[in-house]
A protein has these predicted regions:
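Active-site histidine-anchored catalytic micro-motif
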Residues: 1-170
Length: 170
């Protein structure tokens, strides 16, 4: 735990005292190994006021192991655990998204070996004073019509109450 905290502290150090905004609705962050992408992820999160009190943090990333004709919202875990502690999952909101959009299901295999969301969690835990429940979503398709339907289901939540963290390979 101490090693991770020290590493995160080093990544965030250049941004201490910089202007932050509570108006940030979304960040796009890389999910490579921390040695390659940690400073970039910290730069993105550091633009957000650490005192922000989001209702939810939507974590969205690509599937690296499982193809799906849509997305998987993980309603099988009550929380994710990192060396910094537990991050709660809003399983009820995950289930609501599945009810609202036929292209959002729960495919446990999509989350089992996936790293793109988990690598963001320590940054969230370290930076924010209050960690909001997460809504973990793995995207398994690049079909534009399907992505548009998923986006339509997520659109009501894209507001000042929530933060969207898009985990990317680039």
């Amino acid at each position: 735990k101490d090693s991770l905290v020290n590493q995160l502290s080093d990544y965030f150090a250049p941004y201490n005292g910089q202007n932050q905004s509570e108006q940030v609705a979304a960040v796009i962050v890389p999910h490579a190994g921390y040695v390659y992408s940690g400073s970039v992820a910290a730069a993105a999160f550091a633009r957000i006021n650490p005192e922000s009190r989001f209702e939810h943090i939507f974590l969205i990333g690509p599937s690296h192991h499982v193809y799906m004709d849509g997305a998987s919202a993980n309603d099988r875990f009550l929380y994710y655990r990192t060396p910094l502690g537990k991050v709660p999952v809003d399983v009820n909101l995950c289930r609501k998204l599945m009810t609202d959009c036929s292209y959002i299901t729960c495919n446990p295999a999509a989350h089992t070996e996936e790293h793109c969301l988990e690598v963001q969690l320590p940054f969230i835990q370290y930076w924010f004073k209050n960690t909001a429940p997460i809504v973990p979503i793995i995207i398994g398709t690049q079909s534009l019509p399907v992505i548009e339907k998923i986006a339509k289901a997520l659109a009501p939540y894209f507001n000042e109450k929530n933060l969207f963290v898009i985990s990317s390979d680039f």
